[in-house]
Regions:
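Domain-length accessory/inserted modules outside core catalytic folds
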Residues: 1-116, 120-259
Length: 259
């Protein structure tokens, strides 16, 4: 698919198509993660600034920026707005852009790690952006404080970012469906192999790896929504300060926070 202004990628494959349109081999998962990380870090930009952000994340040369700047503004600006709406919505419908299940577990886990790396990079870029506000006082006023829950969620995403597919055996009992984000660190080791050498998995191992992968994606979803709710939903933080009564009348606090 060749993307034109007015179209917004809705999943991994469509974002991959857009990247091909702008002659980029960059990871769709990492780009989506970077946008979500920036939003979760309280970054709110114009379409043109989202284009600059996305093209910078992609490491696009100046020629790409000149040729595709308007298209990037349309596509990445609308993508950021749509994803912000999804994160704010209390339907908990947020999903990271990752490959379909017909891709190998190795490719999907690699994309999962790329998504988390993108998120962490985007989140860090948002913090740097806030510090460039006209004054330190304004920057401090615009920045919520990190809760322990947010710090631990970011730490877990950092661990997932380093994950590689386990090639031999894949424990499935390390994940607790009732686990709070503030509990002991996520057992990412279930994806790790001592030497990282790939070989053909037995059927049971493949099924275990698949189950573990899906569980970690669900944890990733909840961790991301927790970070956004407790830190990145800057609009609600400001409204809490200015009009608690108006806030209480809203239905909008997303319930993605883990307690």
């Amino acid at each position: 698919m060749n993307y034109s202004a007015g179209l917004t990628p809705q999943n991994f494959d469509e974002l991959a198509d857009w990247l091909l349109t702008v002659s980029s081999q960059f990871s769709p998962a990492e780009l989506h993660g970077a946008i979500i990380g920036a939003l979760s870090g309280t970054m709110r930009l114009s379409d043109e600034k989202w284009a600059q952000f996305g093209l910078a994340v992609m490491g696009a040369p100046i020629e790409t920026m000149q040729q595709f700047g308007d298209l990037a503004a349309s596509v990445l600006g609308s993508l950021a707005r749509e994803q912000l709406a999804v994160l704010i919505d209390d339907d908990l419908a947020f999903q990271p852009f990752l490959p379909d299940d017909d891709e190998t577990i190795e490719d999907r886990t690699d994309a999962l790690s790329q998504w988390c790396r993108g998120f962490l990079g985007g989140f860090a870029e948002a913090q740097a952006y806030l510090q460039k506000q006209p004054s330190q006082e304004q920057a401090a006023a615009n920045t919520p404080s990190f809760s322990e829950t947010v710090q631990e969620a970011i730490s877990d995403l950092s661990a997932i970012a380093q994950a590689v597919v386990e090639d031999e055996g894949c424990p499935v009992d390390d994940y607790d469906d009732d686990r709070d984000i503030g509990d002991a660190p996520l057992a990412i080791e279930s994806f790790l192999n001592e030497d990282g050498e790939a070989f053909e998995q037995e059927a049971g191992d493949a099924q275990a790896a698949e189950k573990n992968y899906m569980e970690i994606i669900e944890y990733l979803r909840l961790a991301t929504m927790t970070i956004f709710t407790e830190y990145g939903w800057i609009e609600i933080h400001h409204q809490q300060e200015s009009s608690p009564a108006a806030l209480s009348a809203q239905s909008g606090n997303p319930n993605g926070t883990l307690h």
